[in-house]
């Protein structure tokens, strides 16, 4: 072995020459993203600036603790980066305190639980079946194992959040924590009403805005900052940053508890390269262009929902106020799993999703979830989403008529044509 080959940081040690297998897989994934329509509601396309920060030399730095209070030396520059991320996040959501270290939205929620609850305490969250998230008290999740989880649902006629049920369950069970948020709910959430209910029973209110955070930052969706005791979010999805989590609050005492819960409670060293990418994304979200983008995200979702309705598809709640569009396939007697597989073969990626009070298993489902954030980033406009709705309908009709292979091939050609007009990276 030569001296040069022993030095892993030499200038010739790029990914392609070092590990061609991983390099080729990444290149194939890039080609997939370029040639397919990404309609998964939790996905987006991060900017090159965000990805450059995430792939930076900050990967090498260990920095247990918080700015100015690290357990390692040599942290003066990563302190600068983390402070920038905190300052920008607080400005973005009009809050006083923030922790940008959680590795994910799930860990951000776990930090809240660790700071406010003890095992056996009662929590109240939206049922997974009705659009909630695993960390909101679902049985398979630790939040459903460590705590007494009470689940609220949606109205069986409108599929809107049943706030009267939320209040009834809160008064009956006296939860210590109420969670307002969702992973598959397309409409506005009444955070003010949630806080009123929390006040009646002396509960903390957690607003999990993982899906809506970018829209909230841009003023396109109601903000919980005035009402929630604590706010958690991911930093990708509509916020268009790296994959990660954050926790925010206006209460200094709660902030101190959260700080201790994140470190040393749940995590050791923060991912400083990811925090740098978060800081970049927050700066991008503070720009006027981000407001224009977010407005288009919602407009495009409304067009997609209306166009799918025009094809006779049942849209949960009848429309959307966000980036999310939920389709109920029960009238077509189709399963979500079959439809998403056919769509993927045609170059359209989305996810199967349970619809309210679904009797199918989560691995099968009776519905589809679409999101418009990624393809709006790509540059698609209303007319393009109307065309996408037509293509989705063609796939569904192909399944009904039994000629899916031919339809998938034709749709795939159209998808590739759309993608070629809107190149990425």
UniProtKB/Swiss-Prot annotation:
Please provide an example of a Pfam family that matches this protein in its UniProt record.
SHMT
Annotated (6S)-5,6,7,8-tetrahydrofolate binding sites: 128, 132-134
Q: Which UniProt keywords apply?
A: Amino-acid biosynthesis, Cytoplasm, One-carbon metabolism, Pyridoxal phosphate, Transferase
The protein's annotated catalytic reaction(s) are:
(6R)-5,10-methylene-5,6,7,8-tetrahydrofolate + glycine + H2O = (6S)-5,6,7,8-tetrahydrofolate + L-serine
Site (Plays an important role in substrate specificity) found at 236
Q: Which InterPro entries match?
A: PyrdxlP-dep_Trfase, PyrdxlP-dep_Trfase_major, PyrdxlP-dep_Trfase_small, Ser_HO-MeTrfase, Ser_HO-MeTrfase-like, Ser_HO-MeTrfase_PLP_BS, SHMT-like_dom
- Tell me which domain of life the UniProt entry assigns to the organism this sequence originates from: Bacteria
Task: Give each disulfide bond as a residue pair.
Answer: none
| Record's subcellular location | Cytoplasm
Pathway stated in the Swiss-Prot or TrEMBL entry: One-carbon metabolism; tetrahydrofolate interconversion; Amino-acid biosynthesis; glycine biosynthesis; glycine from L-serine: step 1/1
Q: What is its EC number?
A: 2.1.2.1
**A biological process from GO:** glycine biosynthetic process from serine
Q: Which cofactor does it need?
A: pyridoxal 5'-phosphate
List the molecular function annotations (GO) for this entry. Answer: glycine hydroxymethyltransferase activity; pyridoxal phosphate binding
Similarity comment text for this entry: Belongs to the SHMT family.
The record's subunit annotation is: Homodimer.
Q: What is the protein's known function?
A: Catalyzes the reversible interconversion of serine and glycine with tetrahydrofolate (THF) serving as the one-carbon carrier. This reaction serves as the major source of one-carbon groups required for the biosynthesis of purines, thymidylate, methionine, and other important biomolecules. Also exhibits THF-independent aldolase activity toward beta-hydroxyamino acids, producing glycine and aldehydes, via a retro-aldol mechanism.
Q: What is this protein called?
A: Serine hydroxymethyltransferase
- Tell me what organism the protein belongs to: Wolbachia pipientis subsp. Culex pipiens (strain wPip)
